Regions:
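N-terminal secretion-targeting helices of virulence/extracellular proteins
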Residues: 1-168, 174-180, 185
Length: 188
């Protein structure tokens, strides 16, 4: 996962796709209810009517499964949108915070000091502390992004195999607690 990619992550396209899936699920649900009503409305008796009703009910059941899958995909897309948006915002904010401390984060996530040379040992130690904090936070953001991708892939595979996706815990991410040490903080 490249840092430059994470800077571009946004949730809006995934959020829009979640809405499309939800609309499709509703359309399939409505169609299955209509078909169910028609199957129940068949009148007459005999093997032909019974066979037609059974075939229609089987189709209704398949349509309901399809609607459930579409609802699941909408949920997955919504969770992905939230995660991508959170990660993208955290990466962009942190990239700016690092730049404010004269630390450049490369496209691959590498960290370089681009400011003036330190005038003292304490200044040099502070620069090294800041660089270590930036490197750690870049690693954390990249880790969170990788975990999000793995979770989304796992959930899509679950839906494809007829199962249900894991719901996101909705817990507070570590991303919103990431900050560089304040100016003048001791290296300890």
């Amino acid at each position: 996962m490249n840092w430059s990619d994470l800077l571009q992550w946004e949730g809006n396209p995934l959020s829009q796709q979640a809405q499309v899936y939800e609309q499709q699920a509703q359309a399939v649900t409505n169609a299955s209810e209509d078909l169910s009503d028609r199957a129940n409305g068949l009148s007459g008796s005999g093997q032909t009517v019974t066979a037609a009703q059974q075939a229609l009910r089987k189709n209704v059941e398949e349509m309901r499964k399809q609607a459930e899958s579409l609802h699941s995909l909408a949920t997955i897309s919504g969770d992905a949108a939230k995660g991508a948006d959170e990660i993208g915002k955290a990466a962009r904010k942190f990239d700016q915070d690092a730049a404010d401390k004269s630390i450049k984060i490369g496209a691959d996530g590498s960290v370089d000091y681009v400011g003036k040379k330190a005038g003292s040992l304490i200044g040099g130690t502070q620069i090294m502390t800041n660089m270590a904090a930036v490197a750690d936070t870049v690693s954390l953001i990249k880790f969170e992004a990788d975990e999000l991708v793995k979770d989304i892939q796992k959930n899509i595979a679950a839906v494809e195999s007829g199962g249900k996706p894991q719901t996101s815990g909705g817990g507070v991410s570590r991303l919103d607690r990431m900050k560089l040490p304040p100016k003048g903080a001791s290296p300890d």
